[in-house]
C-alpha cells in the first residue's frame, strides 16, 4: 500500500465536543466522521482497524466450532411481542413501519430472530449442539449518544447464539465461549478482565462480562486480593457484616434544623458517617399491587438499583413523591426514617444496616433525627437484603480485600436457559421422540467498541499506540524526498516488498511531506513500527527505526531491522 494512493486525512484541531481521548483521537486521525448524533462514517483508515478486529474474532469463533450466518437488522414486531421485549426493551428499541403499515424494529440484539431461525432449522436432538454467529450492525436509540463510537446509536457487533438439548451442554459451550473470548482479547493485545455480571435486559441464569482496563472506563470493576474473584459493581458482593453489637445507648431525639443529609447530620453530631442510616422512599408496583417501601442503607453507602430490583416485589419501582411521603410517613425529605410512620409501610434494610446498633436515622419529623436507635427495641426487625454497592476496602467472601478499578465493557456471555425458546416454541425431538424446549446461550462482542476501548488503554500525548494486531499497518516505511531521489525511492520500495514477503502488514509513506509532518501523522494514527529511508542512511547502509512505544529512534542494518520487526 502506497499512502499517496490512500485516503489519509488527519487534523491538528481537537474537536470541542469530544470528551473521551478515543473520540478525540479517532476524529483527529481521520478514522471516523460524524454523520448525525450517534452515527459515524468509518473512513478507509478506520475500516482497516475494524477489519483487523473482525478477522481475529471470526478466526477464534470458527476455531471454537461456531458457524457463521446472518440475520436481517430489520425484524418484525410479532417476534419481539412473543418474548415480551417489544415493551420491555423500552425507548432504545427503534420502531419503524413499512409502506404496508407493518411494524418492525431495527435490531439492538437478535435473540428472537436467532431463535426463530433455530426453530425452523432444527428438529432433532441429533442436530445439537450448534452455535450460530454473525458480525452485523445493531442500533440502539440511546437518549444521549456520546463518546464517539464508545456509545453510539449504530454499532458493529459479533453476536452468537447456541442451542442445546441439556443444560450441561449449555454450560460446556458457555465455558468454550469464555475461552474463545479470552483468546480474542489476548490476540488483540489488550489488558482485559472477565467479571461476574448481571444479565440485564437480555435475561438468563448466568452471565459474565469482558472489560478492557482503562482509567476512563464507565464501569467499576471489583476484584479480591484473596482469589481470582472479579465482578462488575452491579453484581459484586461483600462478605457478611460482623454480628450486631448490643445496644449501649438510649434512643433520643436530636435537633437537626437544616441538616438533611447523612453527611451534615454526622458533622453536626460529631460522629462517624458509618453510624448514620440513609432512608430512600420508593413506590413499587402498579395499581392495586402498589406499595410504599422505605429502603435503608448506611450513610456512607449507595443503593445498588440492580440488586434492589431482585428483591421480591421491587423489580419495578420509582421514587416516591413528596405527597406520597407525607401520606405514608407524615414527614418531608431529609428527615425520613422507619420509626412511627403515618401508615404501615414495607421496610427493606441492607445487611449492613440490619447489623447496626446505636445508629442515627430520620425522626419522620421536619428538623429532627433520632440517635441511639436499635433494632428490636425501638423498631421491628426489618426485611434484610444485600442492596448496596460494595466499596474499596470491604472484606471479600474469600477473606481478601475488595479493590476497585475502571473498565470498558467489550464482551458479554449469557446462559439464557429456555426463556426465549419457550416463548417462541423452539423445540426438537429428544432421544425418546418427545418435544423438548432447547436451552440457549448468547455471546456478544462490541467490535466497534473494542476499537475505542483499545485507544483508551493505548495512547499518549502524540496519539494512538496500537497493539500490532489492531494497527492499520504494522510497519510504515517513510521515504524522505521520494520524488527528488530515485535511489531512495527504489530502496524504500524494495524494503516494502521484503517486509511483505516476511509476512508483515506494511505500507509506504511516499506522500512527499516534510519529515516532521510525516512522523507526526504516523504517531497520531498509531503505527507500531516506523522505518525511515533516507539518502544519509543509505550511504551508511542503515535504516532509522523507531517503535511507537520507544522514546528514541535507532539506526539498524537491514538484517537486524528485519529480525527486529519479525521478532
UniProtKB/Swiss-Prot annotation:
HAMAP family per record: Pro_tRNA_synth_type1
One GO biological process term: prolyl-tRNA aminoacylation
GO MF annotation terms: aminoacyl-tRNA deacylase activity; ATP binding; proline-tRNA ligase activity
Signal peptide (residue range): none
Name used for this protein in its record: Proline--tRNA ligase
Pfam families: HGTP_anticodon, tRNA-synt_2b, tRNA_edit
Keywords, alphabetical: Aminoacyl-tRNA synthetase, ATP-binding, Cytoplasm, Ligase, Nucleotide-binding, Protein biosynthesis
Purpose of the protein: Catalyzes the attachment of proline to tRNA(Pro) in a two-step reaction: proline is first activated by ATP to form Pro-AMP and then transferred to the acceptor end of tRNA(Pro). As ProRS can inadvertently accommodate and process non-cognate amino acids such as alanine and cysteine, to avoid such errors it has two additional distinct editing activities against alanine. One activity is designated as 'pretransfer' editing and involves the tRNA(Pro)-independent hydrolysis of activated Ala-AMP.
Assembly information from the UniProt record: Homodimer.
Gene3D superfamilies documented for this protein: Anticodon-binding domain, Bira Bifunctional Protein, Domain 2, YbaK/aminoacyl-tRNA synthetase-associated domain
Gene it is expressed from: proS
Subcellular compartments: Cytoplasm
Enzyme class name: ligase
EC number from the UniProt entry: 6.1.1.15
Reactions this protein catalyses: tRNA(Pro) + L-proline + ATP = L-prolyl-tRNA(Pro) + AMP + diphosphate
Domain of life of the organism encoding this protein: Bacteria
Gene Ontology terms: cellular component: cytosol
This protein's domain notes: Consists of three domains: the N-terminal catalytic domain, the editing domain and the C-terminal anticodon-binding domain.
Family, per entry: Belongs to the class-II aminoacyl-tRNA synthetase family. ProS type 1 subfamily.
Amino acid at each position: 500500500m502506497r499512502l499517496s494512493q490512500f485516503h489519509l486525512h488527519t487534523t491538528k484541531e481537537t474537536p470541542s465536543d469530544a470528551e473521551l481521548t478515543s473520540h478525540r483521537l479517532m476524529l483527529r486521525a481521520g478514522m471516523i466522521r460524524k454523520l448525525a448524533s450517534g452515527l459515524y462514517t468509518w473512513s478507509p483508515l478506520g475500516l482497516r482497524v475494524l477489519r483487523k478486529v473482525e478477522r481475529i474474532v471470526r478466526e477464534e469463533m470458527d476455531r471454537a466450532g461456531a458457524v457463521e450466518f446472518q440475520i436481517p437488522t430489520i425484524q418484525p414486531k410479532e417476534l419481539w411481542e412473543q418474548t415480551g421485549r417489544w415493551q420491555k426493551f423500552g425507548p432504545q428499541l427503534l420502531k419503524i413501519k413499512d409502506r404496508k403499515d407493518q411494524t418492525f424494529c431495527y435490531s439492538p440484539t437478535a435473540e428472537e430472530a436467532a431463535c426463530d431461525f433455530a426453530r425452523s432449522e432444527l428438529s432433532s436432538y441429533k442436530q445439537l449442539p450448534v452455535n450460530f454467529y454473525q458480525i452485523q450492525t445493531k442500533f440502539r436509540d440511546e437518549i444521549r449518544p456520546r463518546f464517539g463510537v464508545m456509545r453510539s446509536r449504530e454499532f458493529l457487533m459479533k453476536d452468537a447464539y447456541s442451542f442445546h438439548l441439556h443444560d450441561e451442554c449449555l454450560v460446556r459451550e458457555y465455558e468454550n465461549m469464555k475461552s474463545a473470548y479470552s483468546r480474542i482479547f489476548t490476540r488483540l493485545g489488550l489488558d482485559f478482565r472477565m467479571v461476574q455480571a448481571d444479565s440485564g435486559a437480555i435475561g438468563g441464569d448466568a452471565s459474565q462480562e469482558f472489560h478492557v482496563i482503562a482509567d476512563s472506563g464507565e464501569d467499576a470493576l471489583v476484584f479480591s486480593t484473596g482469589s481470582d474473584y472479579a465482578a462488575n459493581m452491579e453484581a459484586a458482593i461483600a462478605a457478611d457484616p460482623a454480628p450486631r453489637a448490643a445496644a449501649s445507648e438510649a434512643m433520643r431525639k436530636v435537633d437537626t434544623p437544616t441538616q438533611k443529609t447523612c453527611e451534615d447530620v454526622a458533622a453536626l453530631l460529631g460522629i462517624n458517617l458509618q453510624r448514620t442510616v440513609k432512608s430512600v422512599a420508593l413506590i413499587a408496583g402498579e395499581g392495586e399491587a402498589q406499595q410504599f417501601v422505605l429502603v435503608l442503607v448506611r450513610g456512607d453507602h449507595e443503593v445498588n438499583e440492580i440488586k434492589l430490583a431482585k428483591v421480591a416485589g421491587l423489580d419495578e419501582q420509582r421514587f416516591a413523591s413528596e405527597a406520597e411521603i407525607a401520606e405514608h410517613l407524615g414527614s418531608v425529605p431529609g428527615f425520613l426514617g422507619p420509626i412511627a410512620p403515618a401508615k404501615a409501610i414495607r421496610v427493606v434494610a441492607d445487611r449492613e444496616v440490619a447489623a447496626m446498633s446505636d445508629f442515627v436515622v430520620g425522626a419522620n419529623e421536619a428538623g429532627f433525627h433520632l440517635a441511639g436507635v436499635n433494632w428490636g427495641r425501638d423498631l421491628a426487625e426489618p426485611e434484610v437484603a444485600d442492596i448496596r454497592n460494595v466499596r474499596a476496602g470491604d472484606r471479600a467472601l474469600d477473606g481478601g480485600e475488595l479493590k476497585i478499578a475502571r473498565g470498558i465493557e467489550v464482551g458479554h456471555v449469557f446462559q439464557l436457559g429456555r426463556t426465549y425458546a419457550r416463548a417462541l416454541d423452539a423445540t426438537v425431538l429428544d432421544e425418546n421422540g418427545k418435544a423438548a424446549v432447547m436451552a440457549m446461550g448468547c455471546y456478544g462482542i462490541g467490535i466497534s467498541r473494542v476499537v475505542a476501548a483499545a485507544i483508551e488503554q493505548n495512547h499518549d500525548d502524540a496519539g494512538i499506540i496500537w497493539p500490532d494486531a489492531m494497527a492499520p499497518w504494522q510497519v510504515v516505511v517513510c521515504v524522505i524526498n521520494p520524488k527528488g531521489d530515485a535511489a531512495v525511492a527504489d530502496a524504500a520500495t524494495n524494503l516494502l516488498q521484503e517486509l511483505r514477503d516476511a509476512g508483515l502488514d506494511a505500507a509506504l509513506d511516499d506522500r512527499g511531506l516534510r519529515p516532521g509532518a510525516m512522523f507526526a501523522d504516523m504517531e497520531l494514527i498509531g503505527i507500531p513500527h516506523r522505518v525511515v529511508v533516507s539518502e544519509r542512511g543509505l550511504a551508511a547502509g542503515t535504516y532509522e527505526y523507531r517503535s511507537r512505544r520507544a522514546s528514541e529512534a535507532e539506526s539498524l542494518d537491514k538484517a537486524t531491522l528485519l529480525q527486529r520487526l519479525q521478532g
